[in-house]
Design a protein with these regions (language model features):
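Conserved beta-strand positions that form and line the central face of beta-propeller blades
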Residues: 26
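Divalent metal-dependent hydrolysis catalytic cores, especially in the metallo-beta-lactamase
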Residues: 2-9, 175-179
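Second-shell residues forming the walls of enzyme active-site clefts
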Residues: 29-190
């Protein structure tokens, strides 16, 4: 389609050294350093004609489970999230970040903020399937108007939430623009 796109930078914040995925892939455990290095990476690849997709919104590095194999939420309060992951993503949005990759990470405190009557299922729905996280928080509160792609759709944190036939339309309704990986093209497109 005439563009190069990188699923990077990883802007997760390493707040749990036992996290098997993020502890070796993040810039730092420091918010400001994560933002500074992510901004420089973003500027550099954009100058080279590559579109960045910061990941994994709303932020990994808190829990010690791996979304490839299990469900793993981000347990931060709204205030703590705003001061950490919200600060990093907000800074990238201000600098013109064109896309993000939504992670299969629940953000229950923000779901409660948007819907105090949320069910347990809604509280722990992965961001890729949550209207509260992608539409209300990302697009509404944070005013992000770029492209949203899901993380890999075969990861257990997503597949354990619902049947695949429900998952695709739910991801689109939640606010995802692109779905990463298909199972059976005929099944998925129907």
């Amino acid at each position: 389609i005439g563009c190069n796109w990188s699923f990077a930078p990883i802007v997760d914040i390493n707040r749990n050294w036992r996290n098997p995925i993020i502890s070796t892939r993040t810039w730092s455990q420091d918010v400001e350093q994560t933002l500074e290095l992510s901004l420089e990476y973003m500027r550099g690849i954009m100058e080279s004609g590559i579109a960045p997709a910061a990941k994994h919104f709303p932020g990994d590095g808190i829990d010690e489970r791996d979304q490839h194999l299990s469900f793993a939420p981000n347990w931060l309060s709204c205030e703590d999230w705003d001061a950490t992951f919200g600060r990093v993503y907000g800074g990238l949005f201000e600098a013109g970040l064109p896309s993000i990759m939504a992670g299969h990470i629940a953000l229950p405190e923000y779901v409660k903020y948007f819907n105090p009557e949320a069910t347990t299922e809604e509280l722990y729905m992965p961001a890729t399937l949550s209207k509260y996280i992608l539409t209300d928080l990302l697009r509404g509160e944070m005013k992000f108007n770029g492209l949203v792609v899901t993380d890999a759709s075969h990861m257990v944190a997503m597949t354990s939430a619902m049947k695949r036939s429900e998952m695709l339309p739910t991801a689109i309704a939640a606010g995802c623009d692109l779905f990463l990986f298909f199972n059976d093209p005929e099944e998925d497109f129907n």
